[in-house]
From Swiss-Prot:
Biological function: Joins adenosylcobinamide-GDP and alpha-ribazole to generate adenosylcobalamin (Ado-cobalamin). Also synthesizes adenosylcobalamin 5'-phosphate from adenosylcobinamide-GDP and alpha-ribazole 5'-phosphate.
Compartment annotation: Cell membrane
An example molecular function term from Gene Ontology annotations: adenosylcobinamide-GDP ribazoletransferase activity
Catalytic activity: alpha-ribazole + adenosylcob(III)inamide-GDP = adenosylcob(III)alamin + GMP + H(+); alpha-ribazole 5'-phosphate + adenosylcob(III)inamide-GDP = adenosylcob(III)alamin 5'-phosphate + GMP + H(+)
Enzyme's top EC category: transferase
Name of the gene: cobS
Protein name: Adenosylcobinamide-GDP ribazoletransferase
């Protein structure tokens, strides 16, 4: 139990800015086991955002409340995944060779494509939240749960693009059991949040995993594999896709 708590808090500390303030073991196996808890981190992040929405909507309009919810998500994660999306777009749309693409993604300076990607990402989230949240506010929790599970999946099927880096803590380090427990947490969580509609749960999970599979193929061609930035980019892409799927399901 002590090891499980260590691994959970390690992943929570890595993926969020929530102050854990614990001396944690940070060995490679801790990150491997901790990957199982990524969907649970999504529950925590999304849950906090959902509570913020419920409080804000009492005082503010829908538009203002959604802006605050999105801002809260960025603050909670330290813009970790959004930054990965921006770095990916700067690298991939430079149309350079693989080595140069990885070098561009490591550059701390932000480029035009990164700016555009981040703006579009936030606008899409804002638009889908405004469309769906009034009738189904639990999308605020469902989207980050599904997107964190997709990180586990793509890290399981992918290969590292470089010999060192934060992405290597998970890529080719996650085993079948970690994928199984992450899937179990995701399915159970979505099952209850989706009013026990198993068909909708399967649709969301299949869509997210299929997108991650395609994104992995794309990353192999462009960068030769996955990096930490590309894991973050996959998170954002699947989060938006989940919103698209929920928009279709809820409004049909």
């Amino acid at each position: 139990m002590k090891e499980l708590l260590n691994d959970f808090f390690l992943i929570l500390q890595l993926l969020t800015r929530i102050p854990v303030n614990r001396n944690l073991l940070c060995r490679r196996e801790n990150f491997r086991r901790g990957a199982s808890f990524m969907p649970l981190v999504g529950v925590i992040v999304g849950g906090i955002q959902w509570i913020i929405y419920k409080l804000c909507i009492i005082i503010f309009s829908l538009n203002v409340s959604i802006v605050i919810v999105i801002l809260a998500g960025i603050v909670l994660t330290g813009a970790l995944h959004v930054d990965g999306l921006g770095d990916m777009c700067d690298g991939f749309f430079s149309f350079k060779e693989k080595g140069k693409i990885i070098e561009i993604m490591k550059d701390s300076r932000i480029g035009t494509y990164a700016c555009l990607a981040i703006i579009i990402d936030i606008l899409l989230k804002y638009s889908f939240f405004c469309s769906i949240v009034p009738s189904f506010s639990l999308i605020i929790i469902i989207a980050p749960v599904m997107s964190r599970f997709s990180i586990v999946f793509i890290a399981f099927i992918g290969k590292p693009a470089k010999s060192t880096g934060s992405g290597n803590l998970f890529v080719e380090n996650i085993g079948k059991w970690q994928l199984f427990w992450a899937a179990f947490i995701t399915v159970i969580t979505l099952f209850f949040l989706m009013n026990m509609n198993f068909i909708y749960v399967i649709i969301l999970i299949f869509a997210g995993l299929f997108m991650s599979f395609l994104f992995n193929v794309f990353c192999n061609r462009k960068a030769g594999g996955l990096t930490g930035d590309l894991l973050g980019a996959n998170n954002e892409i699947v989060e938006i896709l989940t919103m698209v799927m929920l928009c279709v399901i809820i409004t049909k």
